[in-house]
Amino acid sequence: MIGLGAGALLGGIFLIGRVRTRPSKAALMISGIAWFVLYVIPTVKYPPSFEAMFNPEAAITYQTLLVGYTVISGISALSTIAAFSKVKKKGKMLAAAAIYLTAIAAAYFVFPDYTIENDSLLPQQTLAAWRSAVSLSMTAFWLSLGTAGGLLWSYGTKS
């Protein structure tokens, strides 16, 4: 399900954005930004919880907070890009990034922390390794999505 949504997001941004660079470079840039906005930023606030995988009550709380924060991150990024798309100045990307990060910083303090009493079912080293594996798999997903999208768009422009 995430693959379909991410692919649609990547394709929609590529079509609407009127990208002027090589398709492979554009696809990797778009997927890199999407990875940062939709995975890295929410994970900083709510790192993967092993407890939420096996406890339905903890999962509901964790998923609600994570999805809410991800939606705020995505909407903030889209609205910032939309607002700055009409600006012709050179520093518009830096200004857009600053406004996005300010909005996310505000959301970081508004959203509650995810804390449960028994979040350490695993030893800390094992939990850190598991979180690293989850992060590596999500990074590989977004990288492969950008690579595949770039190859498909390159192939589509040649025919």
How would you label these PLM feature ranges?
Residues A148-S159:
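Membrane-interface capping segments at transmembrane-helix boundaries
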Residues T21-G32, S85-T102:
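Internal alpha-helical transmembrane segments of multi-pass membrane proteins
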Residues M1-A6:
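Individual transmembrane alpha-helix segments
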Residues T70-S79, A97-F109:
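Hydrophobic core of alpha-helical transmembrane segments in multi-pass integral membrane proteins
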Residues V19-M53, A105-L121:
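Hydrophobic alpha-helical transmembrane segments of integral membrane proteins
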Residues F36-K92:
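Membrane-proximal helix-loop-helix units in multi-pass membrane proteins
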Residues I116-S135:
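Short, membrane-exposed interhelical loops at transmembrane-helix boundaries
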Residues G11:
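Metallocofactor- and cofactor-centric catalytic cores in central/energy metabolism, strongly enriched
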